[in-house]
Amino acid sequence: MAQMNFGGVIENVMTREEFPLEKAREILKDETIAVIGYGVQGPGQSLNLRDNGFNIIVGQRPGKTYEKAVADGWVPGETLFGIEEACEKATIVMCLLSDAAVMSVWPTIKPYLTPGKALYFSHGFAITWNDRTGVVPPTDIDVIMVAPKGSGTSLRTMFLEGRGLNSSYAIYQDATGKAWEKTIALGIGIGSGYLFETTFIREATSDLTGERGSLMGAIQGLLLAQYEVLRENGHTPSEAFNETVEELTQSLMPLFAKNGMDWMYANCSTTAQRGALDWMGPFHDAIKPVVEKLYANVKCGNEAQISIDSNSKPDYREKLEEELKALRESEMWQTAVTVRKLRPENN
């Protein structure tokens, strides 16, 4: 395990140098790994494991997702099964269902979690708030997690490009004494770049905070606020969108992703430098109390309960589509459609 300096704090990380793919294969050579759920994370993780030479099967109920698995090369009766049969065959059950689906399918999965098996998650939600989800594993199995820091699509794309998506890992229960090595081996097998240690509760709280905050909720709120102010002051949709979204996503984000924010500040105009340095403080001071409120709401379980209640409603999909339709048809994101068409690579 390597020790790395993260902003002055030393953390332990695991890379492919310390734990090569060959070692992962050796550790898991006698295991049958079943990916349960072929939705968001399922395809990327299962296909990467398959391509890396592991004994992998998929468990999925009939429907569109099942047909997608067939299209991806999983063979019914050989490597593709119903959930019950896949869980029965598996020694490692990778539960990659959505949080809502885990709750409904858990009674189906649990009887097959016999002593010595391992139960794997890629999100700490179901275990962290198991007083709300009802997901309480048997005490005589390993319960482990590898959580890629990105979508299943990104995990697969980066794997095919010869790169890797960083992942966190955690061990909730070690009944066999081998949970750690299984966890790291699976993390390497799915195509992780490097692996850093966490706990189920830390992963769940940071993940929900990030999704509602800077990764999705807050970024939409910030972009829309700036776009609206520009439009209210006479700027055209094209100008407002370019100055708010397009320049950020197409020009600036790749720069600070590669080189850091200080590098980006150092390589922009003096007018931009001064303004950014002066205004980052007021934005920080305005936003931090909102993030603190968000984190508290996540940590106490309120956000988990909101998600559970919402996803459990029979008309959830219909209401979700209504909300997404409103977002999609808003002026800002309709402007985006035209702007994207005008990008040079699309002409």
Regions found by a protein language model. Give the residues of each.
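NAD(P)-dependent Rossmann-like dehydrogenase/reductase catalytic/cofactor-binding core
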Residues: 2-6, 11-17, 232-347
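NAD(P)+-binding Rossmann beta1-loop-alpha1 motif at the extreme N-terminus of oxidoreductases
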Residues: 2-77
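Rossmann-fold dinucleotide-binding core
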Residues: 120-212
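Rossmann-like NAD(P)-binding element
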Residues: 61, 70-128, 136-151
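Small-residue helix-packing motif on alpha-helices
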Residues: 66, 86, 102, 237-241
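Active-site-proximal catalytic alpha-helix in oxidoreductases
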Residues: 177-232, 238-256
